[in-house]
Amino acid sequence: MWAEKLLARYLEGVPFQIVLEHSRLVANTALDVCERLEMPLNNRVFIEEAALLHDIGVSRVNAPELGLHGDQPYITHGVLGRAILESEGYPLHALVCERHIGVGLTLADILKQNLPLPHRDMYPVSLAEEIICFADLFYSKKPDKLTHKKSVERVRKNLFAFGDEKLRVFEGWVVRFGV
């Protein structure tokens, strides 16, 4: 698929294998949601492509545990991915990159946490963005946990630290998308 080839232009070796495996797991979970929602084929194709590319921005971050030695903080991988995919001519896929962090980031989140990100809302808006964001919550890129799917309860516990609103968003997705 073209999305995997594009990913391979930005990552190589072990980092490529980690991100590809993670992205395939996210894509498969997202496609399961699409099946439950009986989404049309063209929507499913976009969701699969965007899920495969959602972490392309890690190619520019510093995450030695993943074999990544870029010069940017990990939290910026969403906006970096957006820039990459916009430059490649994929503006809708690019938005998925920017909006997939946690359950999404609001301007208030960015300011309150003093995150090194542009000052704007970065939360999923479209159904496709929400589905990919939801699916991504179940998987880690940590090599020793790469193929382990987190339980709904584990995701809840992870999100709890970020506040009730983040948990409410996730709970809404659980009801809407199933698991």
What positions do the PLM features span?
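Charged phosphate-binding loop/patch that engages nucleotide di/tri-phosphates or the phosphate backbone
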Residues: K157-V179
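Divalent metal-dependent catalytic cores for phosphoryl transfer on phosphate-bearing substrates
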Residues: L11, M39-V152
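A short, charge-rich alpha-helical start-of-domain segment used by transcription regulators
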Residues: Q17-H22
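Generic structural signal for well-ordered, non-transmembrane alpha-helical segments
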Residues: R24, P91, V175-G178
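Generic N-terminal amphipathic, Lys/Arg-enriched alpha-helix
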Residues: M1-F16
